From Swiss-Prot:
This is Large ribosomal subunit protein bL12. InterPro entries: Ribosomal_bL12, Ribosomal_bL12_C, Ribosomal_bL12_C/ClpS-like, Ribosomal_bL12_oligo, Ribosomal_bL12_oligo_N_sf. GO terms for biological process: translation. It comes from Mycolicibacterium paratuberculosis (strain ATCC BAA-968 / K-10) (Mycobacterium paratuberculosis). GO terms for molecular function: mRNA binding; structural constituent of ribosome. Belongs to the bacterial ribosomal protein bL12 family. The lineage of its organism: Bacteria, Bacillati, Actinomycetota, Actinomycetes, Mycobacteriales.
């Protein structure tokens, strides 16, 4: 395979769906044994690790934000979805909202999941955090 420039890679990513990008990130992490988690998530998990070992093992550190329905204010929900999910175009955001229930964010920190849920609910959506 020919070497791709950064611009070529970005163009290829722009054409991918959110789920395809998520799969790509997972495979990239596995292949290169790295993580794409934000440094904030690591800092937030730090104090929990200092507590009792049994509690740290049971406490969930990664959450999925699932859009159950858009409600009556679909346009507002689409705007918030574009804000929350980086790099998402208007058509992709609309398709995501129309296809609910769909996962919007996967394996994010609790603060990010709660923030996304609050924004989506304020826009009129029904959201579940798992």
């Amino acid at each position: 395979m020919a070497k791709m420039s950064t611009d070529d890679l970005l163009d290829a990513f722009k054409e991918m769906t959110l789920l395809e990008l998520s799969d790509f990130v997972k495979k990239f992490e596995e292949t290169f044994e790295v993580t794409a988690a934000a440094p904030v998530a690591v800092a937030a998990a730090g104090p929990a690790a200092g507590g009792a070992p049994a509690e740290a093992a049971e406490e969930q550190s990664e959450f999925d934000v699932i859009l159950e329905s858009a409600g009556d204010k679909k346009i507002g929900v689409i705007k918030v979805v574009r804000e929350i999910v980086s790099g998402l175009g208007l058509k992709e955001a609309k398709d995501l909202v129309d296809g609910a229930p769909k996962p919007l964010l996967e394996k994010v920190a609790k603060e990010a999941a709660d923030d996304a849920k609050a924004k989506l609910e304020a826009a009129g959506a029904t959201v579940t955090v798992k």
